[in-house]
Amino acid sequence: MSLLGRDYNSELNSLDNGPQSPSESSSSITSENVHPAGEAGLSMMQTLIHLLKCNIGTGLLGLPLAIKNAGLLVGPVSLLAIGVLTVHCMVILLNCAQHLSQRLQKTFVNYGEATMYGLETCPNTWLRAHAVWGRYTVSFLLVITQLGFCSVYFMFMADNLQQMVEKAHVTSNICQPREILTLTPILDIRFYMLIILPFLILLVFIQNLKVLSVFSTLANITTLGSMALIFEYIMEGIPYPSNLPLMANWKTFLLFFGTAIFTFEGVGMVLPLKNQMKHPQQFSFVLYLGMSIVIILYILLGTLGYMKFGSDTQASITLNLPNCWLYQSVKLMYSIGIFFTYALQFHVPAEIIIPFAISQVSESWALFVDLSVRSALVCLTCVSAILIPRLDLVISLVGSVSSSALALIIPALLEIVIFYSEDMSCVTIAKDIMISIVGLLGCIFGTYQALYELPQPISHSMANSTGVHA
């Protein structure tokens, strides 16, 4: 069972049966053929593990700098607000998908299909005629966002591997406050990326979520261990934050928004995870529990990290930790967690692109094309990480554009489109419009600031360190 329960034979056969409508024809290559409820599916615990791992990524380590960019008061409050809005929009998306699946008598509709079918019910003639572009737009944004996550993961793992290997001779057994060491790299970071590349290619060949849940459990254990060490250090002797600004400059706040919205990485996995549950009706409880844990963790780490290091807060909190073997292990454990998280985030673009690719070949070539496309996409994320020196700003850009649209703008507008004709209250309409405006403003101004900062010169070491921890 793959993430979306795809079966090559049924998928290829469905192409020969003839669609019932133009919309179904256009979406047949990405429709998920799900298992009936009650068959082998994910348990609540397995789903919770996947949900946590999807949302606890590299962005978590950059939250102290994000709080610094917003201010000691404005940062945590804004992070809480973004978290609540994101979860609310996840619930909206789930409700819209469930409503459409019941109306159309479908077992399941994905994000793109929900957008397309929703536009088909819109009173506007032009939108109805071009409803399929709603699915294309969502699919494009999902691919860009998820592959952007994967590119960050590549740089993160390579940078940490480089630091652990090349700074081994200056790493001590005594843990003292960090002295920032500027060492000339022995090997280019691209060499470390190429070392990681074949292992990630093999990892993404695993399509079974129940198998991946084992790796997710291991990833959560290593991440929990690294978080325990980080919290143990930052909570020891926190200085009184009297000199820290409660509100930062508005320009840096725009970068905070892009980073914060990017940090909530799991919006693309919400519908597939619910689809793969043995009892999908339990997903709401899993979502609220999991995202509550995530939001609390984000606020605590970001706020305490900034209070601990103040103006010296680095792009990743790991750069502020003592240069000893105990805290070097944080990089190793977190990198292991990110390694397995790569496979989860990779599933979404793979399941959008691969069905189209295999529909162009005969059944005998389906498996070969599947594995080839997976390998090519992993290589693409590697090349992206190699070519982009300021990945921190690129991720802020991706967060401002793609993540804002997927997490805030589209779900809110989709609720209006789908439920407007069903006596939708004015309060709900106003709420959805406000959410869309917040997402749109963040998208516009966050994009502007990221593009403004992108051409600015930056040292090689800073490019590496900031690039992986956005």
Swiss-Prot record:
One of its GO terms (molecular function) is L-alanine transmembrane transporter activity. Disulfide bonds: none annotated. It comes from the Eukaryota. One of its GO terms (biological process) is L-alanine transport. The chain crosses the membrane at residues 47-67, 72-92, 138-158, 186-206, 211-231, 253-273, 285-305, 338-358, 368-388, 393-413, 426-446. GO terms for cellular component: vacuolar membrane. Keywords: Membrane, Transmembrane, Transmembrane helix. Pfam families: Aa_trans (PF01490). Residues 21-31 have a biased composition (Low complexity). The keyword Transmembrane applies. Residues 10-20 have a biased composition (Polar residues). Residues 10-33 are annotated as: Disordered. It is a multi-pass membrane protein. Residues 68-71, 159-185, 232-252, 306-337, 389-392, 447-470 are extracellular. It is found in: Membrane. Specifically expressed in testis. Residues 1-46, 93-137, 207-210, 274-284, 359-367, 414-425 are cytoplasmic. The keyword NADP does not apply. Belongs to the amino acid/polyamine transporter 2 family. This is Proton-coupled amino acid transporter 3. It comes from Homo sapiens. The lineage of its organism: Eukaryota, Metazoa, Chordata, Craniata, Vertebrata. The gene is SLC36A3.
